[in-house]
A protein has these predicted regions:
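Beta1/beta-strand and adjacent pyrophosphate-binding region of the FAD-binding site
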Residues: 4-18, 40
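Conserved Rossmann-like nucleotide-cofactor binding loop
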Residues: 18, 47, 190
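Active-site catalytic pocket residues across diverse enzymes, especially alpha/beta-hydrolases
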Residues: 26-30, 197, 201
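Glycine-rich FAD pyrophosphate-binding loop
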Residues: 27-51
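N-terminal FAD cofactor-binding segment of flavoenzymes
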Residues: 44-92
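Feature captures the FAD/FMN-dependent oxidoreductase FAD-binding
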Residues: 77-79, 87-194
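Central beta-strand plus flanking loop segment that forms part of the substrate or channel wall
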Residues: 202-230
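Conserved small/polar residues in nucleotide/adenosyl-binding loops
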Residues: 233
Length: 233
């Protein structure tokens, strides 16, 4: 099957915070050096942020370095953390407040912000496009491309127009090859292509096993008078 191809200097797989920040920083460096650079971000979601479900307590040091003027650029960081209260639930009906002296520094969030990570990604995408990054939402990277020496040379996106029976429909369209001198895999936890790369290049050798957790998101409607009274347990 013949697929159309596009060539870039850097192909970034994943339009989450790490992929978008990578693309932005690369273009910033290129512009500082007056160098030509082509960067593409391919994202499986129908739009940037569509697959970002996380609410987030956001520490800003990375954003401070990437966009020092973010406070004047309408970044979606509007709700600063006012205080921390941590409770330990010892049973279904009992618990107690943990004294501050026993709370590690890393668990204090003064100066951080309560944000929607999806909205932050949308904002980062707008900054990336302003830096001339190409962003392709709605295209899932499904295959890693290798050259004759086994070196990664980009990715291919999924074919479209495949029926439930696996047969091609009239609307069939072959995926695209996005070829890059460098490919950055920023798929997040247990990304399909990332797992292939880990296995192919034996990246787990002499490494501790990874730990994974499942996050559950709840949206509560509360009395506006209580909107600041949030405790982490």
């Amino acid at each position: 099957m013949v697929r159309e191809s596009m060539d870039f200097d850097v192909v970034v797989v994943g339009g989450g915070p790490s992929g978008l920040a990578t693309a932005c920083r690369l273009m910033q460096l290129a512009k500082e050096k007056n160098s030509e650079l082509s960067v593409v971000v391919v994202e499986k979601g129908s739009e940037i942020g569509a697959h970002i479900l996380s609410g987030n307590v956001f520490e800003t040091s990375g954003l401070d370095e990437l966009f020092p003027d973010w406070k004047t650029q309408d970044a979606p960081l509007k709700t600063p953390v006012s205080k921390d209260i941590i409770h330990y639930l010892s049973s279904e009906k009992k618990g107690f407040k943990v004294p501050n002296i026993f709370i590690p520094k890393t668990m204090h969030n003064k100066g951080n912000y309560i944000i929607s990570l999806g909205k932050l990604c949308q904002w980062l995408a707008s900054k990336a496009e302003a830096l001339d990054v190409n962003i392709f939402p709605g295209f899932a990277a499904s295959e890693i491309l290798y050259d004759e020496n086994g070196v990664v040379m980009g990715v291919a996106t999924s074919d479209m127009g495949i029926g439930a029976d696996g047969e091609r429909k009239e609307s069939f369209q072959a995926g695209y090859e996005l070829r890059g001198k460098y490919t950055v895999f920023a798929e997040g936890c247990r990304g399909n292509l990332g797992e292939q790369i880990i296995e192919k290049f034996d990246l787990r050798k002499n490494s501790d096993p990874q730990h994974y957790g499942i996050g559950l998101k709840e949206i509560w409607e509360i009395d506006p008078k209580l909107h600041e009274a949030v405790s982490y347990t």
